[in-house]
Curated annotation (Swiss-Prot):
It comes from the Bacteria. This is Ribosomal RNA small subunit methyltransferase H. It is found in: Cytoplasm. Pfam families: Methyltransf_5 (PF01795). One of its GO terms (biological process) is rRNA base methylation. NCBIfam families: 16S rRNA (cytosine(1402)-N(4))-methyltransferase RsmH. Belongs to the methyltransferase superfamily. RsmH family. InterPro entries: RsmH, SAM-dep_MeTrfase_MraW_recog, SAM-dependent_MTases_sf. The keyword rRNA processing applies. Its EC number is 2.1.1.199. Gene3D superfamilies: Putative methyltransferase TM0872, insert domain, Vaccinia Virus protein VP39.
Length: 332
């Protein structure tokens, strides 16, 4: 496997400032190389909160777990790294709270969405059109169907739907048609460069090619890993896991994810006034959460200049109120 490195963590100062406020359990649901987790642990130490705190790191990529173990070695006694999907966050946290972390409250949860630079830069993973490699795109390489399975077996209508829904690609139908034509005329689509060539054959303008390639690869990655389904579950389970005054921060990198986060957070923070047209003096149920950030936070110019990945990042933060409130099925 080619040598690659994990990206600089995005918006670290904002994560620490808006998330780390008191002692307790902190959950990094998208561990990656451990950059955000390291910043959280250092902030807890510097604020004198280390003794009553613990960090749980979750990632489904075994390579990420191994890298994070090295990054967080100096905090080994106060960390637990779990290989799993962040959609399982509630089960992972509750299991640890019943045993090792009994009596501790969940003070903060961080979700940094999207694919890491390490995965993009590792050609064997097939995440990038800029590198020649197999069309894999699985976050955990040994599980589930790959991108190659999708582009070589799905019907034209199914491919177009994936490209439009998950990539918002305007030429989704034409690209899907070109993929099927390639399969009929030339056989199996074998790697990232075959797929890139197909997209370029449909989109002739160079600037538009780059955008369409990004959208198509994004759409396939989302489909392969059921990223939106996982995000929906993670938002619900994360919110349900928070203790009173606990906060959840979510960082997204494209509009589809950000809309999901924005909508769900607003739903959690809204009082239930019952059916429309029924006048009530008080809500049927008061919201158990409050929006900490009314608008998405973005990276500063200095960070964007140093780290291009920060350019598209948006962070939203929500907090559970002091009184107890359950997240019901209707909240999702």
């Amino acid at each position: 496997m080619g040598k690659a490195a994990y990206h600089l963590p995005v918006m670290v100062r904002e994560v620490v400032a808006w998330l780390v406020r008191r002692a307790g359990i902190y959950v990094d649901g998208t561990l990656g190389g451990g950059g955000h987790s390291l910043a959280i642990l250092r902030a807890l130490r510097d604020k004198g909160l280390e003794k009553g705190s613990f960090l749980i790191g979750i990632d489904q990529d075994s390579f990420a777990i191994a890298e994070a173990e090295r990054t967080l070695a100096s905090f080994r006694e106060r960390t637990r790294l779990v290989q799993g999907n962040f959609r399982e966050i509630a089960d992972i946290v509750s299991t640890l709270r019943e045993n090792q972390l009994r009596g501790m409250e969940v003070a903060g949860i961080l979700l940094d969405l999207g694919v890491s630079s390490f995965q993009i830069d590792t050609s064997e993973r097939g995440f990038s059109y800029l590198r020649s490699g197999p069309l894999d795109m699985r976050m955990e390489p040994d599980e589930g169907q790959s991108a190659a399975d999708i582009v070589n077996t799905f019907e034209e209508r199914e491919l177009a739907d994936i490209f439009f829904r998950f990539g918002e690609e305007k030429k989704s139908r034409r690209i899907a048609s070109a993929i099927c034509s390639w399969r009929n005329e030339r056989g199996v689509i074998r790697g990232t460069q075959d797929l890139a060539a197909i997209v370029r054959s449909v989109v002739s303008v160079p600037d538009q090619q780059i955008k369409s390639l990004s959208r198509i690869f994004q759409a396939l990655r989302i489909a392969v890993n059921d990223e939106l389904g996982a995000l929906e579950s993670a938002l619900k389970e994360g919110a349900a896991s928070l203790s009173p005054q606990g906060r959840m921060a979510v960082m997204s990198y494209h509009s589809i994810e950000d809309r999901m986060v924005k909508h769900y957070f607003r739903t959690l923070a809204a009082d239930d006034w019952g059916p429309k047209g029924v006048a009530l003096r008080e809500p049927l149920h008061k919201a158990a959460f409050t929006l900490v950030t009314r608008k998405a936070l973005i990276a500063g110019d200095d960070e964007v200049n140093e780290n291009s990945r920060a350019r598209s990042a948006k962070m939203r933060v929500i907090e559970r109120k002091m009184y107890s409130g359950e997240v019901s099925e209707s909240d999702s």
